[in-house]
Amino acid sequence: MKPIFCFILACNTFIAAFSQDFHITLSGGATNYSGDLQVKRYTFDQSHPAIALGLAYGLNEKLYIRSQVMLGKLSAHDKFNPLTAMRNLNFTSSLTEVNVAAEYYLRDMSEYAVSPYLFAGMAAYHFNPYTNDTTGTKYFLQPLSTEGQGFYQDRQPYKLTQFAIPFGGGVKLALGENIRVGIEFGIRKLFTDYFDDVSTTYIDPNLLLANRGPKTLELAYRGSELKNGLPYQTGENRGSAKFKDWYYFTGITTSIRLGNRNGSRIKSRSRLGCPTKI
């Protein structure tokens, strides 16, 4: 009985000591994307709400390792851009991301109440672009092969779960010893140009019709739905494969330390008490 009691006591002591270096993180804000249907590098136009929940571990008061799960939505429509309005394409996609990153504070937050920070890491994300036809029926775009993926030349179907490189920064304010709030901007470098299902050129409509049917032909080019819409030419640019797509997050983040800071392992490496400098 005594060994069991000692084991339980040791486990509780270990968990209590290490939990005080952990922070629960919660972020809320907006996601947007930059690509063939949204050429602006950064804008709130067509943005959507997003939320992220995670856990951060403090190696010291300036360097943290964090992991998050983010849920969001991305969309864009040619009608908002005069240069591409005649193409009339659009997409919407849900977004699920899991990331791990290192977060570095430029100032010791045990001493300073405010500090800018930078982060970079790795992420896996899942997307699935879709559109609605003129009757309002929803169609997922990847199975349609709108640019001939899977049967035309060397164009291969794109994967719906891929890797990205998240990086960015922000500013955090310490509200006492255990709570921090801040503003964060994070960019995701993607390795696909098909987040929006648009990348290369139009293929022969007869070939598209023969291999994927009338619905793919209808949704591959939607300029014909417009009053003065013109037909496309085979080989004409549908998008630009020169640049990959991006998406980004802007929002407010909050972190709460698990356990009281007094007695934590960080305590032995830094000053005690609330930050005293701005």
Where are these regions (language model features)?
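Outer-membrane beta-barrel transmembrane domain signature
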Residues: 121-245
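Extracellular loop and loop/strand-boundary signature of outer-membrane beta-barrel proteins
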Residues: 34-42, 83-91, 151-157, 237-240
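Short loop/turn motifs that connect adjacent beta-strands in outer-membrane beta-barrel proteins
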Residues: 19-21, 62, 108-115, 132, ...
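Outer-membrane beta-barrel proteins
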Residues: 33-39, 75-80, 126-132, 191-196, ...
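Residues on the lipid-exposed face of transmembrane beta-strands in outer-membrane beta-barrel proteins
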Residues: 26, 53-57, 100-104, 120-122, ...
